Amino acid sequence: MAGEGVVSTYVLAQELEGTCGNVHSTFRSSMNVQADGFLLHIGATTDSLSCLGIAIPENEIKTLLKWTRRGDLAFLSKGVLRIYSRAGATRIEYGDFKPVDTTVPPLGDGWCVDVLRSAIAAIDFCGETGLPPSQDLAWVLRDLSCAALGARGVESVRAAARFLVGRGLGLTPSGDDFLAGYGTALRARSLKDLLAGFSMDELSERTTDVSAAYLRAMAEGHANSAFIDLVRSLRVGDGDLCQGTVAEICSVGHTSGHDSLLGFVVGIGLLESIGGPGCFACESRTGRIAS
């Protein structure tokens, strides 16, 4: 597998030379390798590129997944990832892959929020998020929205992050996906003082390895390629690109895409456009507000 894939600039910036590890987890169309504390995602070029990863042709990832099991050995050296599965050694020469910049670009002046407002108009975030509705959640979303709009400070972000981290099920709990999206929006808006509310030493101990890796990448200014495209669509006011990217994000996982998009929307300052914090205090998805 040489020269046929893409690799994130975040991966290329890591010191992975000579590291050993193993297959951490496998999914329907992707997998994770953990080496020397770094979680490397391997996906298909037909999907959005993970900021933690590399992507290879779809037929090749399918073949790799067919023979690979959790715990299989992996070794990285000179831009080559070797995975030792039941089929033998597979070489992925990611050093020859096309690099994709996963650095979150600044929105700058004159960006267009209306294209995002239009793209999310039909999404039922209250029904699609994996975060259980509660009055506490409503308060947290209100505080994060106020912080994004300049009416709250970094302590509100810090308290909200403690509430959300690890909240939910799966390898990337819904609260973590939300925080990744929210932090990406803050980065795009150059609100670096609020980003200080993400204390990675504390947060990483309270969630999964996978979530901790994505939150760490977010804190260092990186995001998955779909979110990079989303920020770019707002910079230039491209409604079609925004609509397509929102759909792409929403297709990720069971609720992960909606959770991360919700965080981004709140970080951009559009919580009121999707019903405000009150709808997330519902006891059920039918709209009854918790007392």
Describe every region a protein language model picked out:
Residues 1-154, 158-159, 166, 170-175, ...:
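Phosphate/adenylate-binding glycine loop and adjacent helical scaffold
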Residues 203, 207-208:
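Small-residue-rich helix-loop
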Residues 226-291:
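Acidic, carboxylate-rich catalytic segments that either coordinate divalent cations
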Residues 58, 180-181, 198, 265, ...:
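Generic preference for flexible, low-structure residues
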Residues 170-187, 256-268:
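Conserved phosphate/anionic-ligand binding catalytic regions in large, soluble enzymes, centered on
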